[in-house]
Structure formats: C-alpha cells, structure tokens
Regions:
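Charge-rich, low-complexity terminal tails
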Residues: 223-226, 255-257
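A basic, amphipathic helix-loop patch mediating RNA/tRNA/ribosome contacts
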Residues: 175-224, 241
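Ferredoxin-like alpha/beta domains used as RNA- or RNAP-binding modules
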Residues: 1-185, 191, 234-259
Length: 259
C-alpha cells in the first residue's frame, strides 16, 4: 500500500494519475500478475518509478520503441522479466503524396484525436523523411480501417516491426544552470536567455505548456522531468534538479530543442 506522504512530493493536478498508477501497483501486489499501463511521458514515468519504489517487491520496466520518449510501463514482481512483445506496441508507417502535402506532428496527432483516440493510447510520432507513429496494439485494426486521410490527403498505413522505428533527427542540446527558484518564469528566463518580463508575458499569453497543459501562472513550480513547450522558441526537458549553492540557488540540468 502506498504511503499517503507520497502525495506531498507531487502537484495536485497529478493526484489522479498517481491514484491510477497506485491502483495498478496494488493489483500486482495482491495478485502477483504483471500489469501494463498506457503510454506515459517522462514526467509520468518518473511518478511511476517513485510510486513503485514505495512498494517492497515491485519492479517497473518501460518501453515505447528504440529511444522513445513516450513509453508504456509493465509493473511486476521483481522476478518477472518482460519481453518487448509484452508491451503490446504497434508501429505504423504512413505513405502519403509528399509532393502535394506537408505533414507535421500536429497533423498526425490531430487526426488521431479526431478519430476518438485518446492521447494516452499513442506513443511517439516521428516526422522525418518518413512518418511513423506508435500506438497500443489493440487499436491496430481500428486505425487501419478508419485512418484514410490526413490534412485532406489520401494516405496508406503499413504495420512494421517496432525494431524498425526510425530515429528522430531532433538535435537536443544539453545545458545546465543555477536559478534563484523553480518558478516557471525564472526557469524560462534562463532557458530562452531573455528578460523575466518577456518570460512572464509568454506565460500570461498562454504560450507556455508544462507536460502538454497550458500554464498561465508565472509562479508555477517546476519539478524534475517536466516537459516545457514555449511557443515561438521550442521545447525543453528538465532532466535533473541538483542541490543548493551557498547563495541558496538551485542547480538544474535540462535539454532544449529550440528553433
């Protein structure tokens, strides 16, 4: 059973996810059978690792394809070793008229959402020379039948081995800094190398998302493994929070994918 004190380490808006993941951990503890989750972003993966760590004999494994960001998790007893096939992933590749239409990440995701598919059922979407996306295997037949057009263009879908997942050509830059606090405006100021006033304006104009949700409060407190999207600049991922300096500043390590 989870220690109630674990909630104090997370945000209130994350409590629902914590409860869902805790229920799955309880299932494994009671029935000794592995449980598979939906796709989790890096923050969700971190939360699940913390929860599993509060149980004595549970293990968690993640997989979403080679070098994936979004992953499914298998919660199990320590003795269980999952295989890749246990994660029930399907990798789809899209064939489309490249000369006549340009497809981007948002077009793929938007089309999937319009078919009634929840975000948690979709893993990484890779837009490169080729376009691929990962989803839960149970949706494969539905997608093959229903997904026929994207952005007005006819498309064909092919199921290919997950091991053939192409690698994103995104070039993330690793960085570190010391900040006076973990307020959203303070950290964004450091990341984009602009004034705190500009950082606040971006937040107040709803141009900043944290873990895919718009945040319009400058004093929002960031935590480890948060994903930040800043309209007009790009994305950032807080990979680690270090200790305090003598001047009570916090070391942060992060990576950026800016334009």
């Amino acid at each position: 059973m989870i220690n109630i004190d674990i909630y104090q380490h997370f945000r209130q808006e994350e409590y629902e996810l914590i409860d869902q993941l805790t229920d799955k951990c309880d299932q494994v503890e009671q029935h000794y059978a592995p449980v598979l989750t939906h796709f989790l972003d890096p923050r969700g993966q971190y939360i699940l690792e913390v929860i599993c760590g509060s149980y004595e004999d549970l293990n968690v494994s993640f997989y979403g394809g080679p070098n994936a960001e979004r992953k499914r998790a298998i919660i199990s007893s320590n003795y269980y070793e999952p295989k890749e096939s246990d994660f029930e992933l399907t990798l789809m590749e899209i064939e489309y008229p490249e000369k006549f239409v340009t497809l981007k990440h948002q077009h793929i995701l938007g089309t999937l959402m319009s078919l009634g598919i929840e975000r948690e059922q979709v893993g990484d979407i890779i837009v490169n020379e080729r376009i691929q996306f990962v989803l839960t295997s149970r949706l494969e037949s539905f997608i093959m039948l229903e997904l026929q057009r994207i952005k007005g263009a006819s498309v064909k879908l092919y199921t290919i081995p997950v091991t053939d997942m192409i690698q994103s050509n995104e070039n993330w830059k690793n960085e570190s800094a010391t900040v006076s606090s973990l307020r959203l405006d303070v950290v964004i100021k450091e990341m984009i190398r602009k004034s705190r006033t500009i950082a606040k304006q971006l937040i107040e104009k709803k141009r900043v998302k944290v873990n895919h949700t718009i945040v319009d409060s400058a004093d929002f407190q960031l935590q480890a493994n948060d994903l930040i999207s800043i309209q007009g600049f790009g994305r950032a991922h807080i990979t680690d929070l270090g200790g305090k300096t003598k001047k009570d500043k916090t070391h942060i390590t992060y990576r950026t994918l800016f334009k």
